[in-house]
A protein has these predicted regions:
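All-alpha prenyltransferase/terpene-synthase fold signal
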Residues: 1-241
Length: 241
């Protein structure tokens, strides 16, 4: 929650999943302090409930990776030289790590904790790639945020990076506009990404991580929880928001 609150401040987002963001409703100052408070609360809960120093160490290192992923994304804003490898490293930190820790915590003190960590990591990768695809959705009432918000904010994700591989000479001059990019130029970016198959390639990549997660979930003991996790993972790939 803390990272999402801070992320909305950084991106100047007015909506998240169709709901008004904290910074939009109450201003950046309150939003930042709220995020800080949530971080403090998180570590207090860890101190109170962590069963071992090893568990506490894993959680704190996980948070470190999440924040480093966010910092890396900020550092690479409007970087037209962004590569797919850079993007995957970013989302491995800022999103996949969060899902991995969540799944690991649910399976802690069981023989499946390490497996759950890997499942969460793959789910997180698929989730973020799908989220980045939705930035190109034509109906922002479904996604809850403006279309092409990531591109406008200088965050170049899988669809753009795949398109750049095929249409570099067309796309690069537009990305190099940086913060000065116009709405007409954003529309050109959209057209290039769609025409070059950038969205299709990104969907295939999300599908790859989804299949990896499902394969690992199949190895868990059969139960209601296992079937529910499998269903959620499948539905996530086809979500509209």
């Amino acid at each position: 929650m803390a990272t999402l609150v801070h992320d909305d401040v950084i991106d100047e987002s007015a909506k998240r999943r169709g709901q008004e963001t904290l910074n939009s409703a109450y201003g950046n100052r309150i939003a930042v302090y709220t995020g800080d408070y949530l971080f403090t609360l998180c570590f207090r809960l860890l101190q109170d409930h962590a069963d071992s120093a090893r568990e506490l160490d894993l959680d704190t290192k996980g948070m470190e990776k999440i924040l480093l992923g966010e910092l890396n994304q900020m550092d690479r804003k409007y970087d037209s030289n962004m590569r797919m490898r850079d993007y995957l490293n970013q989302i491995q930190g800022k999103t996949a790590q969060l899902f991995a820790l969540s799944c690991y915590s649910g399976a802690y003190n069981t023989p499946y904790a390490r497996q759950a960590y890997q499942i969460g990591s793959n789910i997180g990768m698929a989730f973020q790639i799908t989220d980045d695809i939705l930035d190109f959705a034509s109906d922002d009432s479904k996604t809850g945020k403006p279309v092409l918000q990531d591109v406008k904010n200088g965050i170049y994700t899988a669809p753009v990076l795949y398109a750049k591989m095929k249409r570099r000479s067309d796309l690069l001059p537009l990305l190099e506009k940086g913060e000065a990019i116009t709405n007409d130029e954003l529309n050109k970016v959209y057209e290039i990404v769609v025409a070059s198959g950038g969205l299709t390639e990104a969907q295939a990549l999300a599908g790859k991580y989804t299949r990896k997660a499902l394969k690992q979930i199949e190895k868990l003991p059969e139960s209601v929880s296992q079937r529910t996790l499998s269903l959620i993972t499948e539905q996530m790939l086809n979500r509209e928001h």
